[in-house]
From Swiss-Prot:
Organism expressing this protein natively: Homo sapiens (Human)
Region annotation (Disordered) ranges: 1-25
Further remark: The helix-loop-helix and basic motifs form a SPZ1 specific bHLH different from the classical one.
Tissue distribution: Specifically and strongly expressed in the testis. Expressed in several tumor cell lines.
Coiled-coil regions, chain positions: 62-102, 214-269, 316-351
Lineage, opening ranks: Eukaryota, Metazoa, Chordata, Craniata, Vertebrata
Coiled coil recorded as keyword: yes
Name assigned to this protein: Spermatogenic leucine zipper protein 1
Function comment: Transcription factor that binds to the DNA sequence 5'-CANNTG-3'(E box) and the G-box motif. May play an important role in the regulation of cell proliferation and differentiation during spermatogenesis.
Amino acid sequence: MASSAKSAEMPTISKTVNPTPDPHQEYLDPRITIALFEIGSHSPSSWGSLPFLKNSSHQVTEQQTAQKFNNLLKEIKDILKNMAGFEEKITEAKELFEETNITEDVSAHKENIRGLDKINEMLSTNLPVSLAPEKEDNEKKQEMILETNITEDVSAHKENIRGLDKINEMLSTNLPVSLAPEKEDNEKKQQMIMENQNSENTAQVFARDLVNRLEEKKVLNETQQSQEKAKNRLNVQEETMKIRNNMEQLLQEAEHWSKQHTELSKLIKSYQKSQKDISETLGNNGVGFQTQPNNEVSAKHELEEQVKKLSHDTYSLQLMAALLENECQILQQRVEILKELHHQKQGTLQEKPIQINYKQDKKNQKPSEAKKVEMYKQNKQAMKGTFWKKDRSCRSLDVCLNKKACNTQFNIHVARKALRGKMRSASSLR
C-alpha cells in the first residue's frame, strides 16, 4: 500500500514542479523543498530501528522505495537547476532592456542640445553682420537726397537772379533817360528780389534745422536700438549659459546613473556566479540542503530591493527628460521670435527706400514749407510704428520667460511628489 501511494505521488510532484518560462510565475514553497530534503536525507540504515520482518516481499518494497526516493532527489536537483537558469535569463533580459532605453534617451538629448547650440551661434553671427551694411546704405541715401534737394533749390533761385540782372543791364544801357518810371519799377523789382532772397535764406535755414533734427533723432533711435539689442543679447546669452549648465548637470547625472546601473549589474552577475558555485557544491556532496532556501530568500529580497532602486532611478531620469523637452520647446519659441524680429526689420528697411523715392518725386515738384512739415509728421508716425512693433516683440519675449518659469515650477512640484512617494514606499517595505 505504501508503494502504491508513493507511486501515485510521483506524477503529481513532477507536474507541479516543472517551471514555465513565464518570469512572473511563483516558485515552490520552501517548506515543501525542506521537507523533501529531510525525507531524502534519512539513510536506509535508520530504518534498522524498525522490527525486522522475515518476509522477502517487505525487503523488495523497501528497496523500491529507496530507489524512488533517490529518483525524487535527482528530479528535485534538476528542477532547482532549471529555476536558476530561468532566473539568469530574466535578469539578463531586464538588464538589456534598461540599458537600451537609457542610451537612447541620452543620445537623443545630446543631439537636441547640439542642434540648439548651432542655431544660437548662427543667429548671433549673422544678425549683426547682415544689418550693418543696410544701415550705412540708408544713411548715405538720405544724405544724398537732402544735398540734391538743397542744390536744386539754390540753382533755380540763382538762375532767376541772373535773368533779372540781365534785364536790368539791358534797360540801363538802352533807356537811361526816357524810361525813368521804368527805373522805379526796376528798383521795386530789385527790392522784391532781395525779399525773395531773404525768404530763400529763411527756407534754407528751416531746411537745415529739419535736417539737423532728423539726424539727431536718427542718432537717438540708433543708440536706443543698440542699447535694446545689447540688453537682449545679454539676456539671451545668460539664458543660454544657464540652459547649458543645466544640460551639463543632467548629462552628468545620467552618466552617474549609468555607472551605478553597471555596478549593480556586476554585483548581480557575481551573486549569480556564487549561487551557481554553491548549487554545484551542494549537488556534488548532497549535504547542507537546508541552508539553501534561506539564502535564496535573502538573495531574492536583495534583488527585489535592487530592482526597486533601478525603477526609481529610471523614473527620475524620465522626469529629467521631460524637463529637457520643456526647455527645448522654450528655446524653439525664442528662435521663432528672433526670426520674426529679423523679418520685421527687413520689412522696415524695404519700406524706407519707397518713402525716399516718394520724397524725391515731391521735391522735384518744388514743395512748400507746409508740405515739408507734413512729411516730417509722417516720418514721426512711421518711427512710432516701428517702436510699437519692437515693444510688442519684447512683450512676447517676457511671455515666454513667464511660461518657462511656470513649467519649471510645475516640474519641480511633480518631482518632489514622486520622490516623497518613493521614500514612503521604501520606508514601509523596511
